[in-house]
From Swiss-Prot:
Shikimate binds at residues 18-20, 64, 89, 104, 220. It comes from the Bacteria. NADP(+) binds at residues 80, 129-133, 153-158, 218, 241. It catalyses: shikimate + NADP(+) = 3-dehydroshikimate + NADPH + H(+). It comes from Chelativorans sp. (strain BNC1). GO terms for cellular component: cytosol. Homodimer. This is Shikimate dehydrogenase (NADP(+)). The gene is aroE. Belongs to the shikimate dehydrogenase family. Pathway: Metabolic intermediate biosynthesis; chorismate biosynthesis; chorismate from D-erythrose 4-phosphate and phosphoenolpyruvate: step 4/7. Keywords: Amino-acid biosynthesis, Aromatic amino acid biosynthesis, NADP, Oxidoreductase. GO terms for biological process: amino acid biosynthetic process; aromatic amino acid family biosynthetic process; chorismate biosynthetic process; shikimate metabolic process.
């Protein structure tokens, strides 16, 4: 176990694009911790072995696509968010056991808290998409007391599956319902790849949204997605997706290294610069 001191990882397949090492290694340096956070490209067929073996070399780590659901099945104990969402993105060791958690729900809410405090008051939320990211967002919204959450997906059965998982306060809708849903939406959340570099193109008419509405996108490449650009042009308040990435990293770092780091403008600048350099 001595080899594992002050080492953490992010594993995925592929994983070279991950900005998590930029975030965690910045915090390690900032807090004077002699440690490392590194990328591990683990193919799906090797993931089970990696989970069994990582405690020999690491204190814990993060899990990204395509391993989040597999990690959920393999860990010994899960936190409430991971249990509900059905996916694990953070691993740590406790009393010799491998623990799993999901910090995406925390990251989503913390990002909005920092940018637009009070966002959850009297909110009516419309969530675009019904994948894993949508599950984390809906969990965050429900945990903040929002009881009118509309899940919209091109395949309505997937939206219904989200509703079945969360029960009360959620409803499933077809994509064609978006114009009607927006008329009383106070928080619009995009969890799809719409507007992402390399993702599908598309346009959502935001004219029906109330002037007081907030529009947020979990996509952060590009930072200003077409959806956010349209919202800003209408004078609506917007929140980009980079903050979710930054904030979701906080709980894991604290568990592994014993210090709760802060998300600061300086950290954001560093990650934005890294994103720009990687274009």
């Amino acid at each position: 176990m001595a080899e594992s001191l002050h080492r953490a990882f992010i594993c995925g397949h592929p994983v070279a694009h991950s900005r998590s090492p930029v975030i965690h290694n910045f915090w390690l340096k900032q807090h004077g911790i002699e440690g490392s956070y590194e990328r591990r490209d683990i193919a799906p067929e090797a993931f089970s072995l990696f989970i069994r073996e990582f405690p020999r070399f690491y204190m814990g780590g993060n899990v990204t696509i395509p391993h989040k659901e597999s990690a959920w099945r393999l860990v010994e104990t899960r936190d409430e968010a991971a249990e509900t969402i059905g996916a694990v993105n953070t691993l740590w060791l406790q009393d010799g056991r491998i623990m799993g958690g999901n910090t995406d729900t925390y990251g989503f809410a913390a990002n909005l808290d920092m940018e637009l405090a009070g966002w959850e008051k009297n909110a009516v939320a419309t969530v675009l998409g019904a994948g894993g990211a949508a599950l984390a967002v809906v969990h965050a919204l429900q945990s903040r007391g929002i009881r009118d959450i509309r899940i919209v997906n091109r395949t309505v059965s997937r939206a219904r599956a989200v509703v079945d998982r969360f029960k009360g306060g959620t409803s499933a809708h077809a994509w064609e319902a978006v114009p009607d849903l927006l008329s009383d939406t106070s928080l619009l959340v995009n969890t799809t790849s719409l507007g992402m570099h390399g993702g599908p193109e598309g346009h959502i008419d935001l004219a029906p949204l109330p002037d007081s509405a907030i529009v947020t996108d979990i996509v952060y490449v590009p930072l200003r997605t077409p959806l956010l650009a349209s919202a800003a042009a209408r004078g609506l308040r917007t929140v980009d997706g980079l903050g979710m990435l930054l904030h979701q990293a906080v709980p894991g770092f604290e568990r592994w290294f014993g210090v709760r780091p802060e998300v600061t403008p300086h950290l954001r600048e560093i990650v934005v610069a890294d994103l720009e350099a990687g274009k």
